[in-house]
């Protein structure tokens, strides 16, 4: 649908493009079919870049010359259709993007700038070419809720009048939004608002509310950190904790350090955090109490400095050990003569020393096996886990390890009178109880 721009924008010097014409829904749908599919748009709902050549010629415009028909733009306004010809952009239509922006910023003719903005940012009629007279454009939108304010203002002369990719007048507004037009749409903006908008701030100065698009964005998560410190004078039942809330970790840590831990005048370094497992056992130094409180607050102030790692630690000692995984440093050598193994931390070296001393301090609670290293015990516990999930009565029989105690194999035809006299129901209960004992949480022993 071609609109007469002259009567709408007399103040900004935009002359008329030509006689105003109205096209029926059938004509618009036929143009959709006639244009075919092009790389930039599926139909008439693409951006209208500029009027056709004879439209500009009839208006006597000299700022911009004609543009070749194509990209669902020129044929939308002309009377003659050329389905077989889809031209490229005319070199004279816009000499460059710079010239276009200069004109819009006031360096060129005001009428030319207004004409350019009217043609570039206006949405042509059309969309997915549906049935004739179909005006439910919101059904074809990615965010249909963005057009809910204009969903009820459909024009009988417009097919799929909403712009397919637009945000209800945010960046590519319809021309009807800036003045009274032939379409009976009641839009959000009046004609005087047209004078002050630039090429990139359309609908930014007078935005309605926070913007319809922002309701689809994730709301910021409000983090509440609660202080669970119990003052010594409030230890009597019922215990009452501090319960002050903070939005950042820094605020919580500062509060606990200043208000509860205290300064050097404090001689007793005791953690009074709610449900602390130390149960009032004091620390020998204040820095140890501060480090311990990070277990409750979750503070980890020591990030790994190596790019791409992203790990953070609550203790500087743990960060120092971790950085050796990046540098490859292994300062702890095995003290056993003839062994050249080196380790990044002393605890790994201590675990390794059990190999030489034949000590096996890591015992399995399900059987009599013991191991020199906790990793070996963890592998062994997986055998018990798999056997407890299966139907084998004895995990040691399928463990794959040689055990010092041979497994006891219970035959179905055993001579044990107690076993043979069990009823099916009682044997089922016995079988279930045995599996429940084996299906304990094995990870709680060794991590």
UniProtKB/Swiss-Prot annotation:
**Main localisation, per the record?**
nucleus
The protein in question is named Zinc finger protein ZIC 1
The organism named in the record is Mus musculus (Mouse)
Which InterPro entries does the annotation name? GLI-like, Znf-C2H2_ZIC1-5/GLI1-3-like, Znf_C2H2_sf, Znf_C2H2_type, Znf_ZIC
Annotated region (Disordered), positions in chain: 375-434
Outline the residue ranges of the record's C2H2-type zinc fingers: 225-260, 269-296, 302-326, 332-356, 362-384
Identify the gene encoding this protein: Zic1
Subunit structure as annotated in this protein's UniProt entry: Interacts (via the C2H2-type domains 3, 4 and 5) with MDFIC (via the C2H2-type domains 3, 4 and 5). Interacts with GLI1; the interaction enhances transcription activation. Interacts with GLI2. Interacts with GLI3; the interaction enhances transcription activation.
Q: What is known of its domains?
A: The C2H2-type 3, 4 and 5 zinc finger domains are necessary for transcription activation.
